[in-house]
Amino acid sequence: MILTEPSPLFAALLIVLAYLIGCVPFAVVVSKLMGLKDPRSYGSKNPGATNVLRTGNKTAAALTLLGDAAKGWFALWLALKLAPGLSSLGYGLVLIAVFLGHLYPVSLGFKGGKGVATALGVLFAVSPWLALATVATWLLVAVVTRYSSLAALVAAFLAPVYYFFGGGTIWPLNAPTAAALVGVSALLFYRHSANIDRLIKGKESRIGSKKA
C-alpha cells in the first residue's frame, strides 16, 4: 500500500516501523553467524563495528558497519516509498525513530550501540553529499589521531552544520530534518560520554588496538 498523503495513524505506524528496523542488532547477528564472541562481552561492550573490529575480524566489522548504516538509510527510504507525501515533520520523526531503535533496541533490553554507523545511514538518506562530507571529516580526524571516538564526535558536531550551510543549494533544507539531525548529534555525544572522559584522561583506545 502506497499513500501519497498518509493519515496521522499511518505516519505513526511508519515511525514505529522505523524504530523496529533500528532495533536489528547487526553486531550481535553478524558475530553469531561468523562464530565470534558476543560483542557485548569484550572490549568496550558496545554492539558496534568498532568493537567488533577488536576481534581482528575485519570482515565481521565491515558487515556490521554496513548493516547498521543500511538500516538507517532503509527506514527513511521505506517511509518515503510507502508514503511519498510524508510531511517533513513525519520524515524527521522517522529519522529519530530509527536512530533511537539502534541506541535503545527492545531486542537487546534497550542497551544498544552508540549510533555512528546508523547516523551515517540516515545522512545518506537525507543527502549522499551530506554523508560524504561527514565521512570525509571522520576519515581525516581518524587518520590523524587514530581515535575512532574523537572522529565520530567531530563528525557528529559538524554534520548539522554542513546540513544548515548546504541546505537550499546542495540539498533541501527544512526545520524538522535540521532539528532531527541536531538531536542525533546530541545523542551521539551523550552515548560517547565515557569516551569523552577517557579522551580527556588519555586512556581512550586507538583504532587497531585490542582491549581485553
Swiss-Prot record:
InterPro entries: G3P_acylTferase_PlsY (IPR003811). GO terms for molecular function: acyl-phosphate glycerol-3-phosphate acyltransferase activity. Its EC number is 2.3.1.275. It is found in: Cell inner membrane. GO terms for biological process: phospholipid biosynthetic process. One of its GO terms (cellular component) is plasma membrane. It catalyses: an acyl phosphate + sn-glycerol 3-phosphate = a 1-acyl-sn-glycero-3-phosphate + phosphate. It is a multi-pass membrane protein. The chain crosses the membrane at residues 10-30, 90-110, 124-144, 150-170, 171-191. Pfam families: G3P_acyltransf. Keywords: Cell inner membrane, Cell membrane, Lipid biosynthesis, Lipid metabolism, Membrane, Phospholipid biosynthesis, Phospholipid metabolism, Transferase, Transmembrane, Transmembrane helix. The keyword Disulfide bond does not apply. Signal peptide: none annotated. Pathway: Lipid metabolism; phospholipid metabolism. It is an enzyme of class 2 (transferase). Belongs to the PlsY family. NCBIfam families: glycerol-3-phosphate 1-O-acyltransferase PlsY. Catalyzes the transfer of an acyl group from acyl-phosphate (acyl-PO(4)) to glycerol-3-phosphate (G3P) to form lysophosphatidic acid (LPA). This enzyme utilizes acyl-phosphate as fatty acyl donor, but not acyl-CoA or acyl-ACP. This is Glycerol-3-phosphate acyltransferase.
